[in-house]
Every structure is written in structure tokens, then in C-alpha cells.
Amino acid sequence: IVPTEVTRTPSAFFALLCAEGVTVLNQTPSAFQALMSAQEEREEAAGNIERANVIAHRLRYVIFGGEALEPRTLASWYARHGERTQLVNMYGITETTVHVTYCALRAEDAMRLGASPIGVRIPDLQLYVLDARREPVPMGVTGELYVGGAGVARGYLNRPELTRERFIDDPFVAGGRLYKTGDLARWRTDGRLEYLGRNDFQVKIRGFRIELGEIEAQLAKVTGVREVVVLARDSASEVHDSATEHATPNALSPSPETSTATAAATATATAPEKRLVAYYTGDADVAALRAQAAQHLPSYMVPSAYVRLDAWPLTPNGKL
């Protein structure tokens, strides 16, 4: 059993993996990013890659779960190690007995921006990508993901209304049941699924309905950006007039300062107006982020603030 303090200290955890010869690791993508950084620091301390390889890990499989994977964050891993360790991305939810799909990743996946590849179904499950009328959507078209099969739970304990809303009759299989995930997905031409985020992550700002993932995908293209998250924050929070360029990991909680390039909307008397805030890790310049957003996104999708973090704030179990 790994001591709690070790699990929360990436350098100590990586040292343990090497010392014990661990071959299979299951982590959240955020925790794995911290582990990658610890490995890079260890290699630098060793002096060169050849010496570092003597104390390298023996991982054969790394399995991701618990949160959405941004494939581009694995580019440095593939650059250092190639494909000798099989990386696997899994998608799942509690209501379907956790695991639903798996995707054996390749180095080329790290070159893709935006969507997270979640692969193909576990054999005893059925997957459907449906539109608002619960009709199958064509390949490449975004829809909501529904899951059927042996893993679907009976429902929520003592919550009959929510059970009726989320667990529905399967219109394609007599006597079957489906779970309405609330997740957006689309089929790729190679038969694999892509995860596109939550349908409730669409926010409405100044009358426009916005998909936050589209903004993140554009900002991720900027050189020097390692990871990026865009949130809709209440304008009623404290606002200043200068650009925020750096913050500590706990900055996701307090309100950041705004950019002078895009003014925050004024809160209404009945409900606070939302504004977009981009948080990122890496060494990208805020001006480059603003320019990318202004060039490729409509004005209502341009974040009003940009906050650089040294590292993502993680929960005790490694989630963002």
C-alpha cells in the first residue's frame, strides 16, 4: 500500500515506481502530468538521458481515467519514450459500473487538438450518439452519448424522478435500458469515439450559447501552452482593470483580474452576468493568447482574463 504522503508527492511517487518495478499504472491525466514533470526533473538531476535510463521506470501500461484527457499533453512523453509504454484512455461513469470505453493511444494522438479520444466500447455494453430527438447522428456530428447493456445500473437510490430522467427505455433494443450520460461525443471515421465535454458546459453569455471546449481548443494551439481550462465566472466577483498574468494553483477559486482588451460585462440586478476566464499552465505570453482568441473566435467567445498557474490545483485523488 502506497503511503498517502507519497501519492501526493510526484517525485517520491515516481521514485517508488522505479524502485518497485511497477509495470501497470492507473492515474488521472492531471496526476500523470505531475508525474511526467517529476521524471523530467529526475533526468535533469541525473545529468543526461543515458544515465537516467539506468533508473528509469518499467511501466508497460498507463491507464487514464477519472477526467478528460487532453492528448496534446502527452507529446513530451512520446518524444522521450516513443510507444514502448502503452498508454490507454478509458471513459466511464458510476451509473454504468464505471468503465464504458477504452482507447489504446498512439503517438499521433498527441498531435490532435481539442477532442479527447475515448475509443471503442467494452464488449458487454452498447453505445449510441443521439440528437435531441434521440435519433442517431451521422459520423462526425456531435450528439449526446447514451450507454446500454449489462453495466447499466438500476437507478438512483430513493430518487425516482432523477432515475426516470436519466435511465430510459432503449428504443433500439426491446426490453433494454439506456443511461443518458449528459456527455457530448462524436464518431470518428476510424470507428473510435471522441469525448467533447459535458452538454451542461455550454454557457450563455450576453445571449450567446458557448461551448467552452471550443475556446480551450483554440488557446491550446498557442506555443508554450501546456494545458488550458476556460471557466465562466460571475462578473459580480471582484474585478480589476489590469491583466492577470500569473497566479498560484489556488487561483481557480478567487476572481482573477481582467484584461483591458475585453471589459467584463456588468452584472444585472437580478442575476450576475457571466464572463470567460482562461487558466493555463506553461510559459505562453498573455498577449499571444489574446491574439489567438481574437483572431479565431467571435468577440463573445474571447476570454476577458487570462491566468497563468504554476500547476493545476488537484483534489486528494488527483482530479483537477
Predicted regions and their residues:
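Adenylate-forming
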Residues: I1-P117, D124-Q126, D131-P136, E161-L162, ...
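AMP-dependent adenylate-forming
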Residues: Q86-N89, C103-P254, A261, A267-L320
